[in-house]
Regions:
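Conserved alpha-helical scaffold segments that buttress catalytic/binding sites
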Residues: 1-192
Length: 192
């Protein structure tokens, strides 16, 4: 879901997806900005790309009636979802690569929301990762050169996404530490 956040390019850093970062930091951020005279509920929004995302994707991806759709709060769930569903390839639409941010050393530690995709490659659970950055990301593929050289990773635009097989599963992550709670109704409209 943070693929669509029009404020992502202003944020650097990392947020572990836990209760504190999902809920409390939004209240803190809201009141800090309000004291400065800024209403972040007006400036922090989703981009217009959300309106035609599914139409563009359906041109190149075959969704069947039995395609599973899973909703979670954390990208960490994607790791288990990929393993449980025995997928060979993952297409990730996100403002972050989730490959791990310490090069190959990222995989020496437990799986988390920032390295789940890289960990799947490292452990041989998937053969290919396809990353479709959101239009507001501040990341770029060269930041992951060491990982890119070690594994089969493609960086695509939304229009370049193609699937030869019907899509078995869709995982949609709200990612609450990146997605402002006042956008929840828009999230529901996107999903349903």
């Amino acid at each position: 879901w943070d693929y669509f956040m029009n404020y992502m390019n202003h944020w650097n850093g990392s947020y572990i997806e836990n209760d504190n970062n999902i809920n409390k930091h939004w209240y803190k951020k809201y009141y800090e900005e309000k004291r400065r005279g800024i209403d972040i509920t007006k400036s922090m929004n989703v981009g217009d790309e959300v309106d035609n995302f599914w139409q563009i994707l359906k041109k190149n991806v075959d969704f069947k009636k039995d395609t599973k759709v899973l909703l979670t709060e954390s990208h960490l769930a994607a790791y288990k979802i990929a393993i449980d569903n025995k997928v060979d390839s993952v297409i990730s639409f996100d403002s972050h690569s989730d490959l791990g941010y310490q090069g190959l050393d990222s995989f020496k530690f437990e799986v988390n929301c920032a390295d789940w995709l890289g960990k799947l490659l490292y452990e041989g659970k998937i053969k290919e990762a396809n990353i479709v950055y959101g239009p507001y990301t501040n990341e770029y593929s060269d930041q992951f050169k060491e990982i890119n050289e070690a594994y089969n990773i493609n960086y695509l635009s939304l229009e370049e996404v193609k699937c030869e097989e019907p899509c078995k599963i869709i995982h949609i992550c709200r990612s609450g530490c990146w997605s402002a709670p006042w956008l929840d109704n828009k999230f529901k409209a996107f999903v349903f």
